[in-house]
Regions:
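Flexible beta-alpha connector loops of hexameric P-loop NTPases
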Residues: 22-28, 50-56, 90-106, 133-142
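Conserved RecA-like P-loop NTPase ATPase core
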Residues: 2, 49, 83, 112, ...
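Generic enzyme active-site microenvironment
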Residues: 81, 126, 153
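Helical hairpin unit composed of two closely spaced alpha helices linked by a short loop
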Residues: 76-123
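C-terminal regions of RecA-like/P-loop NTPase motor modules
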Residues: 40-41, 60-77, 94-96, 114-119, ...
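Hydrophobic/aromatic beta-strand patches that form the interior of the parallel beta-sheet core
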Residues: 48-50, 124, 158
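Cytosolic-facing regulatory segments adjacent to core modules
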Residues: 1-76, 144, 184, 189-190
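Conserved H-loop
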Residues: 3, 125-128
């Protein structure tokens, strides 16, 4: 919804091939083929990327796609990523309906959660913070943009937090905001490594979690 299929595929290629986005287009054909062969040897599974125009697709479109993939390709995903919730459409409210943003975003969240239950797969998406949340190093549910109906509907929410100190050591902080499946105070905060050039996230040592966990 936000990015072209090709741009998303490039990011995934950079991650899998362990090359930077900048170097991806300059890879010699032989090296490219070698990396592809290595990936095929060491991994399994299928990934399907589908692009929709911004604010035009809703849960019924995603449901139709899942059914089409099941019939034509015998494919059922293990997880569905939607980029991102706030620029989806609602199947209950038309774009020009006289409805406020609270109800509209809440409706989208409810429809996607319903689809997840129906298809028996997790659906992961993203949202943004309010203007004050952008400069807040301790983001909370109240910093969710547009509609508090979104965190009221979600089963699991976490915030990704960055600042100059974390950027200097190539890390981002993760804070659990809501968790219906476990105690959200367990591992409430932790850091993970990030390599933005290769679109990668990775674990960091326990020694780097000091003072963050459950604080």
């Amino acid at each position: 919804l936000e990015m072209a299929e090709e741009r998303i595929a490039e990011r995934i290629d950079a991650n899998l091939m362990n090359v930077s986005m900048e170097d991806l287009h300059d890879l010699p054909k032989s090296m490219y083929e070698s990396k592809i062969a290595q990936i095929q040897k060491n991994t399994s599974g299928e990934l399907i990327i589908k692009e929709y125009p911004t604010a035009s697709a809703h849960s019924a479109h995603f449901r139709g796609l899942l059914k089409e993939l099941a019939i034509k390709k015998s494919f059922k995903p293990d997880i569905l990523f939607i980029d991102y919730l706030n620029i989806c459409a609602s199947s209950r409210y038309k774009g020009q309906s006289n409805v406020n943003s609270y109800m509209y975003i809440k409706s989208i969240a409810e429809e996607l959660r319903g689809l997840a239950v129906e298809a028996n797969i997790p659906i992961m998406s993203a949202t943004q913070t309010t203007r004050s949340g952008f400069s807040n190093s301790d983001v909370g549910l109240e910093d969710t943009s547009e509609s508090f109906g979104l965190p009221a509907t979600a089963d699991l929410m976490f915030a990704l937090i960055s600042n100059e100190e974390l950027e200097a050591v190539n890390q981002i902080a993760v804070k659990q905001l809501k968790n219906r499946y476990n105690d959200p105070t367990m591992n409430k905060r932790f850091v993970i490594g990030i390599d933005r050039s290769k679109m990668r996230l990775m674990d960091v040592g326990e020694d780097q979690q000091t003072g963050l966990a459950d604080s």
